[in-house]
């Protein structure tokens, strides 16, 4: 994890370490996890099964991602740090560096190269252990937990702002670049499903229409024929 966070500004000095095991029919499945958040905008997660690197992840990665999202959202709601919609997995994992290692008595892989773990029982095992242990860590380290939640909230706001900017650009492209002649008096709403575009001929008609229109949902395009 320290290597993954090299040249990054970490949010918390302590690397969070989680261990657990679950007995299955053929023996015990052991889980080890180390994770730390930084100011980076991407995630970096490495997965291993019986010391073999799984570059394509697999069921241990799926379980980890689900647990992280659930645990951070649960803590944020409990401490009233989350006022709007639940944080997405992408928001929670932004800036995360993690290494998850599984010891399995009889693992299954997607191919002979063992690039991806496909043992289905591992998903639930990892999910349960990580959710419980990470929740305990958050309760015992509230300052670290708050930093992680705040990082995710910032990521969520940034993603929403970027989405609105993309929607606005697309919308203007449709209205302005779709072959409508003349000038456009845009409306306030950014929801295409409720917006209307009126074609108005002539300056005098355009002036009257501007005065009488609902600026929130009605846009005008002034044309000259």
Residues of each region from the PLM?
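GHKL-family ATPase ATP-binding module
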Residues: 1-222
């Amino acid at each position: 994890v320290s290597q993954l966070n090299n040249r990054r500004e970490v949010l918390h000095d302590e690397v969070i370490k989680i261990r657990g095991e679950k007995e299955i029919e053929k023996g015990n499945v052991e889980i080890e996890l180390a994770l730390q958040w930084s100011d980076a905008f991407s995630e970096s997660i490495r997965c291993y099964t019986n010391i073999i690197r799984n570059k394509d992840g697999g069921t241990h990665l799926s379980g980890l991602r689900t647990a992280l999202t659930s645990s951070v959202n649960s803590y944020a709601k409990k401490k009233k740090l989350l006022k709007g919609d639940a944080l997405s997995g992408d928001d929670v994992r932004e800036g995360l560096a993690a290494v998850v290692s599984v010891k399995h008595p009889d693992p299954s892989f997607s191919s002979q190269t063992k690039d991806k773990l496909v043992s289905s029982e591992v998903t639930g095992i990892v999910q349960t252990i990580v959710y419980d242990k990470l929740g305990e860590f958050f309760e015992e380290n509230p300052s670290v937990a708050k930093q992680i939640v705040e990082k995710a909230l910032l990521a969520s706001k940034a993603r929403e702002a970027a989405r609105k900017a993309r929607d606005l650009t697309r919308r203007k492209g449709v209205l302005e670049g779709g072959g409508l002649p003349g000038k456009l008096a845009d409306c306030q709403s950014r929801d295409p499903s409720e917006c209307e575009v009126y074609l108005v001929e002539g300056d005098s008609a355009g002036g009257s229409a501007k005065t009488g229109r609902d600026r929130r949902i009605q846009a005008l395009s002034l044309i000259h024929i």
